[in-house]
Amino acid sequence: VKKNILLFFLLVLTLASITFAAPLKGTIQVVGSTSVQPLAEELAQAFMAKNPGVKIFVQGGGSGAGITSAINGTADIGNSSRELKPEEATAGIHETVIAKDGIAVIAHPANSVKNLTVEEIQKIYLGEITNWKEVGGPNLSIALVNREAGSGTRGAFEELVMGKNAGKMSNKTLVQASTGAVQQTVAITKEAIGYISLGSLDPKAVKALLVNGVEASDQNITNKTYKLWRPFLMLTKTAPRGVTKAFIDWILSMEGQKIVARDYITVK
């Protein structure tokens, strides 16, 4: 009997020590980069399926809007597809790298040009090279497609390709407000050149050019032979807490990174 009583008390103590996690509940507002947006939406859907008490609302607006929203606390998470500038980093916001993504330089599929050097791309966007025949292509005036000021993809492109000439880009460009709009424009414009998120590339619609003879691919970004890539950041006003922390922690888990790996480069 004493043995049974002892076992009973041990069982009670064991059960008492188990903490049952309450179901997650809450709302998360996510704002920012249109390059990060498709991935953020996919991650949000998977997380909400696991946690029916959580509602996540994802919208674009560009990296500038995401960074500002995080600094001001007007969104729970701000998405950025470029590194923070020094003045942004000093605002005290907390950043989490959730993925890495390449920048693909794209042309119309019918364009015979297959490769451009970084210097040639820079000269094209400076307006110094204006015809495709100057880089071995057809006799067509080059139509420049650019992203809007505040775009993280544009910010990364300016840093990685334009360098100190970032402020001198030609103003004879067709400015588009999202990765999808750039891709769509290049797909229907034979003389166009543009740049987009590699993870959003549709090879049936546009052609990704080699850069310095290297293909834009996850493998070449990982082995550091393709140089045009940037991090995908999730930004919060302070260290993430509550349901926001649970969401970001899950993104960094094996389960979350499996979703990242479908189209992007994992951080683990």
Residue ranges of predicted features:
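Positively charged n-region of N-terminal signal peptides that target proteins for export
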Residues: 1-7
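Bacterial N-terminal signal peptides
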Residues: 7-17
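Exported/periplasmic ABC-transporter solute-binding proteins
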Residues: 20-268
